[in-house]
């Protein structure tokens, strides 16, 4: 009998507890039923790049054309940033050039419908700096001639960036003729260098 009384008290207590909850104003938390996916706003695939001649000046020839025609490279500013840049090659070629434009490397170069990245052999996610050559001096020690061999180099397209191997690289495309890059230029050759 004692067990029956205890069971009845327990049942009454539970029923009373349930009745008291009805009067409370607290509601269950509101749970959102749909998932919202937002795109990541930061660029996780950005390729580190630099303006030529600012952070690094000495470069080792890494392509066959650079080893045979130009040799290693030293790049330096003549004055403040935005002014002329001197490209001094170990094989006796010296070029002074004035930057005149910065374009995305994936834009058209005017060479057979190719982008600057394709012409230079660079990364399409970086910029290409376009230079107008002011002076080109070719020493007699430069057996192959200048960057455009016997023709005068008129324009350069340059990119400095970190490649897939994690190395800083410097890529140059040399153009002869009157047409600027982007307007039917005559591509002479492309040269590749790695940081020393």
Feature roles, as predicted:
Residues 1-17:
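Sec-dependent bacterial lipoprotein signal peptides
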Residues 19-22:
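Bacterial signal peptide processing site
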Residues 26-45:
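N-terminal low-complexity, Pro/Thr-rich disordered segments
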Residues 43-67:
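Tryptophan-anchored aromatic micro-motifs
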Residues 53-56, 74-84, 160-169, 196:
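Short, solvent-exposed coil/turn segments at beta-strand boundaries
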Residues 61-94, 113, 140-151:
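Short, solvent-exposed loop/hinge segments that bridge or flank secondary-structure elements
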Residues 82-123:
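Central antiparallel beta-sheet cores of small beta-barrel/beta-sandwich binding domains
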Residues 119-196:
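Beta-strand-rich cores of mature extracytoplasmic or soluble domains
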């Amino acid at each position: 009998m004692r067990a029956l009384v205890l069971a009845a008290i327990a049942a009454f207590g539970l029923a009373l507890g349930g009745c008291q909850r009805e009067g409370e104003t607290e509601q269950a938390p509101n749970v959102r039923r749909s998932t919202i996916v937002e795109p990541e706003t930061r660029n996780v695939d950005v390729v580190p790049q630099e303006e030529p001649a600012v952070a690094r000046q000495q470069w080792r020839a890494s392509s066959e054309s650079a080893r045979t025609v130009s040799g290693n490279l030293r790049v330096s500013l003549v004055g403040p940033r935005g002014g002329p840049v001197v490209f001094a090659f170990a094989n006796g070629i010296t070029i002074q050039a004035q930057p005149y434009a910065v374009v995305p490397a994936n834009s058209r170069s005017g060479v057979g419908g190719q982008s600057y990245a394709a012409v230079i052999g660079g990364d399409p996610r970086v910029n290409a700096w376009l230079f107008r050559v002011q002076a080109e001096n070719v020493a007699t020690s430069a057996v192959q001639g200048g960057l455009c061999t016997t023709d005068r180099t008129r324009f350069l397209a340059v990119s400095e960036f970190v490649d897939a191997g994690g190395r800083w690289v410097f890529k140059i495309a040399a153009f002869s003729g009157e047409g600027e890059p982007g307007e039917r230029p005559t591509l002479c050759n492309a040269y590749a260098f790695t940081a020393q």
